[in-house]
């Protein structure tokens, strides 16, 4: 077994019982793996985030915001509900951790904790938490724009979003409270 690991973090001072810091962790995306469906901005192309591009871009994730939309079906960069403090690539998974703003968004924390989503007004629970994550990028370079599946060779992460796994480009993403 060949395990590759790249990791970065920013140190947040420990504040026991802080009401607005709820630790989270999860998988943002998979590297060197084609997306399950085309992400927004890819002109209908599925994408592969190369390991090299992801490793080089890890520093750009730190301190970036985690956002959501009320229906958990898209990104909404104006609804920032948390901050990313650590990012690492373990195997093919780009793992994140950080803090949700729990006092400001208690309903989101509760939905992640319970696995219940209220999209469309009707609460429903699934056996597996239905929420995942999706990355937000800028300055992307594509190896060959004529390719059926775009290979991203350079990116700058500008944040991430919590959304329903069935709406994410990579369905094997997830988020949970620590």
State each model region's role.
Residues 88-178:
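Residue microenvironments linked to proteolytic maturation
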Residues 60-75, 133:
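Short conserved beta-strand and strand-loop elements enriched in small hydrophobics
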Residues 29-40, 55-56, 72-77, 103-110, ...:
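Short, surface-exposed beta-strand/loop "edge" segments at domain boundaries and coil↔beta transitions
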Residues 22-26, 64-66, 94, 133, ...:
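A broad, low-specificity signal marking well-ordered, structured residues that form hydrophobic/aromatic
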Residues 24, 56-57, 69-70, 90-94, ...:
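Domain-core detector
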Residues 45-57, 83-88, 114-118:
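Short low-complexity stretches enriched in small and charged residues
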Residues 7-17, 73-89, 141:
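Short amphipathic beta-strand and strand-loop transition segments with alternating hydrophobic
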Residues 1-65:
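Polar/acidic, low-complexity leader/linker segments enriched in S/T/G and N/D
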């Amino acid at each position: 077994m060949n395990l590759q690991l790249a990791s970065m973090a920013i140190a947040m001072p420990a504040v026991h019982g802080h009401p607005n810091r709820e630790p989270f962790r999860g998988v943002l995306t998979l590297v060197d793996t084609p997306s399950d469906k085309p992400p927004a901005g890819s002109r209908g192309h599925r994408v592969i985030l190369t390991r090299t591009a992801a490793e080089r871009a890890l520093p750009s994730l730190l301190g970036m915001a985690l956002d959501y939309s009320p229906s958990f079906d898209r990104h909404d960069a104006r609804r920032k509900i948390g901050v990313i403090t650590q990012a690492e690539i373990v195997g093919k998974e780009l793992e994140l951790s950080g803090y949700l703003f729990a006092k400001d968004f208690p309903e989101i924390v509760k939905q992640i904790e319970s696995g219940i989503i209220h999209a469309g007004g009707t609460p429903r629970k699934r056996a597996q938490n239905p929420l995942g994550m999706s990355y937000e990028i800028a300055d992307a370079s594509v190896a060959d724009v004529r390719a059926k599946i775009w290979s991203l060779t350079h990116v700058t992460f500008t944040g991430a979003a919590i959304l329903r796994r069935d709406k994410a480009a990579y369905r094997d993403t997830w988020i949970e409270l620590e």
